[in-house]
Amino acid sequence: MPISRAGLAPMTPIVAALVLAFGAAASQAQSLSEVVQAARGVDAAYLGARSNADAAHYRYEQARSAHLPTAGLQVQAARDSSTSPTPISTTAIINQTSKTTSLGGTVNAQQNIFNRQNDLTIDQAQKNEDIAQSQLAQADQDLIVRVAQAYFNVLAAADALNSVQGNSKAIAEQLASAKRNFEVGNATITDTREAEARADLARSKEIAAENDLLVAKVTLDQLVGRNGVAPHPLILPATLPPVMPSQVSDWVALAESDSQALKQARVGLEVAELATARARAGHLPTLVANATYGRTRAREAIDGEGTFTGNSRNAGVSVTLNVPIFSGFLIQNQVNEAVALEQKARTDADGARNQVVLATRTAFVGALSQAAQVKALEAAEASSKLSLDATLLGFKVGVKVNLDVLNAQSQLYDTQRDAAGARYQYLVAQLKLRQAAGTLGNNDLLPIDALLVR
């Protein structure tokens, strides 16, 4: 592809795609909170967790039905016909036919009076619903972090492209200056060749930056379920919030009380304990009350005798006590299995705590490190500007060569790119720290929205 060395290069297909796909996106610029809310409506992982929470609630309602009475209606209809020999005298017998038609119904009702296993099953279902709700909250926190990462990836890619384009323009100007100086005999061809090489390299970087921006935009659009999502850029100079609380022990304490992963492990242990108690309850008797009420209407027609009609009723109440005596060691082995699984759940809970504490400490150190990197890069950016100004002045008076100017320019634009990326990563690092502690929510997005151009 030909490169214009006197100015900016012509528009590439990637840039054209960006203009066509996202040129009208300014009207769709959205804050981070708005983008996260939109993603909740389309993200498969979040929607799956929400459906799982709904299913867990319905399983709990199913378990509760064991405490409620059950009733059923049975309706019977029958028609019988029979023929039998009937003596009519001492010497004569005739075949007599009898036809019977009946219609009846019976209502049966049952109520559990005592069943300890049912009680514990309900408690387990309630705990499992709590786990599903915690998983939903965890999925929401994960979605916030993923959207924020994609959101700031777009901004970082846009800043990187701006830096590369600025560097390309500066190199083009330096190339034009080198050519003029060579033509008038004030410089050698070496300066021109160095500027041309830098221009070619800058063009390659610009193409890569354009592609990175396009990929970042497509990724964000897919995550949000919309086309042309345009993140609000960061207000500069940016005043980034510090990591608060400032002590890692405070974050660890928050994680031990609020971490969704730790909550799930602890409730999972409670479920396992209930499973053990439920298995042991297999040794206990059960008591069930039953009630029955039925009515039947019958009509019988007998040849030679006429038709007879009658009604019958029956009602009854009973209590059934079931006492387990021997089950082939089934219950004992069920108890042993539940005890083993309970021990596993206890070990898993201890392991989950260790993992949560480690993740929180790691996220805390990462956030502090990212904050320090932002400060260092911002200082480096200021120093690079001063260095470039001094180099340009030295070039004008003849104590610096063209290569020195090109190096100073590249250093400045690279530092600007890195500083911008570090600021975005610091904001994401803060969200990841709150995610590790289990406190991440919508309110944590509002301070970030305040840092963005509206």
Regions found by a protein language model. Give the residues of each.
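Bacterial Sec-pathway N-terminal export signals of envelope proteins
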Residues: 27-76, 82-84, 111, 126, ...
